């Protein structure tokens, strides 16, 4: 099946789920950053809500007054197939992806449409690989999950770091993330859904391992180890059971530049040991409560989908990820940093990922690919121009 020609489609980019909390932030970012001549549209279930969003966008970006609005619903696969067939790149913020995501992935894979999401749900991503990787490879579609704070800073940060180390040598990288940010109802819902399904998550991972090719003559690892004390970052490292190490490992498996023997470990960097211990215990308690349906509903009700931090709270938020790396006798520390990670910077990362797929000169890839593999330096440059900092730390 040849790669499908998408150049004659009605739109360069469509944002699906535009009226949600993160979707509206992404729409606002696109409104002020799409290049001249970009053909883009907003999509969602409610035309009335889409019209309200378009009116708000037009107040600061008058050209948005005539922005096309497309009605589509995750419960109506036919509407999603039409959506995918009309655009070159489809961006979605509609989660939890385990509940709402697969019909759109299937539609994009079949139509040869590039797909970008914010998914941090390992089970969903593994299932999409097993079910739709072959179709996407055949059609030429690039399926790029985890294109927000999960997992762009880590994926591109490690790629940036590896590029500063000698080639052809074993490489070790430890990532330490710190932030003061809040989160939204949609994020809480997705996290609780994922935490409530440990057995299903493990089963999906095994199914993927059975069919996914492994690098030949190279070793790639992302172990989940014990807490560590990092003298370089002056923090306690609490292991994070997030998707990010898996994404980094998949980039390393796909790119020879990561060396013959690559290892990545992923931590929350915490200044004081009691806080580290308390955070680990608290996360464990939430995961335990997520197994009980009534407790999960109670936790989910603390924040409704569509709710999120205020603009004032987001303005005070920040993130820093430090990478302590070594290889070939070279040791260095790099850092990726920016503002509010969960929303303002996530909207930026998602939007720039979509714009990169739509307009940048990128390597020929297809199927389920990471941001480091699909966009690499092009996306890093975009994010640097947009204010996210990549650099070497001078100790």
Residue ranges: model-predicted function:
Residues 97-210, 243, 250:
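Glycine-/Pro-rich loop/turn segments that contact NAD(P) or position catalytic residues
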Residues 29-37, 255-256:
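A short, Lys/Arg-enriched amphipathic alpha-helix followed by its capping loop at the start of a domain
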Residues 12-31:
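N-terminal Rossmann NAD(P)H-binding glycine-rich loop of SDR-like oxidoreductase domains
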Residues 70-89, 93-99:
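Conserved Rossmann-fold cofactor-binding substructure of NAD(P)-dependent oxidoreductases
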Residues 35-49:
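Conserved glycine-rich Rossmann-like NAD(P)H-binding loop of the short-chain dehydrogenase/reductase
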